[in-house]
Swiss-Prot record:
Site feature: Transition state stabilizer: H19
Any one GO biological process: coenzyme A biosynthetic process
Name of the gene this protein is made from: coaD
Gene3D superfamilies found in the cross-reference section: HUPs (3.40.50.620)
Main location as per UniProt: cytoplasm
A GO molecular function held by the record: pantetheine-phosphate adenylyltransferase activity
Protein name from the UniProt record: Phosphopantetheine adenylyltransferase
Family designation: Belongs to the bacterial CoaD family.
CDD domains linked to this entry: PPAT
Residues the entry annotates as binding substrate: S11, K43, L75, R89
Organism of this sequence: Geobacter metallireducens (strain ATCC 53774 / DSM 7210 / GS-15)
Length: 163
């Protein structure tokens, strides 16, 4: 029986417990999840691509069924190059759905072989985003329940340096 592989794309700047929840729940459905960090030069990221990959690899170190990679270009092309057939997207609210629906439709128009699976975030993470985490952290607010400890420390380091 062929392995069921899904790609979970994003900027993960930084990875949060909301992202990790989607990965954990996705692994109930798929044999492997590729956490695909987008090389998006249009986004102004706090962490470099290498820093983000390193953090995610360290957070997922004990999970042999999740691996981290980077991609640029069309997501559909990347998914097919990895012998995957599904893109996982987490949805927090209705406002996420409209944008994600349009992207899923575009991806489907490019390749009929790639499906998009929308997963609703678990209730405790319904409001959580990397942007909120960065904003709270930049103001020295508590982010303990939002990100893993190593991410919290990386954020603390970033915001303690003059910018």
């Amino acid at each position: 029986m062929p392995r069921k592989v899904a790609v979970y794309p994003g900027s993960f700047d930084p990875i949060t417990y909301g992202h990790l929840d989607i990965i954990d729940r996705g692994l109930r459905i798929f044999d492997e999840i590729i956490v695909a960090v987008a090389r998006n030069s249009a986004k102004n990221s706090l962490f470099s691509i290498d820093e983000r990959v390193d953090m995610i690899q360290r957070v997922l170190a004990d999970n042999v069924r999740a691996r981290v990679d980077t991609f640029d270009g069309l997501l559909v092309d990347y998914v097919l190059s990895q012998n995957a057939t599904v893109i996982i997207r987490g949805l927090r609210a209705i406002s996420d759905f409209e944008y994600e629906f349009q992207i899923a439709q575009m991806n489907r128009s490019i390749s009929q072989d790639v499906e998009t699976l929308f997963m609703m975030t678990s209730v405790p993470f319904g409001y959580l985003s990397s942007s909120i985490v960065k904003e709270v952290s930049s103001l020295n607010g508590p982010i303990d329940g939002l990100v893993p400890p190593l991410v919290r420390e990386a954020l603390k380091d970033k915001f303690s340096k003059p910018r």
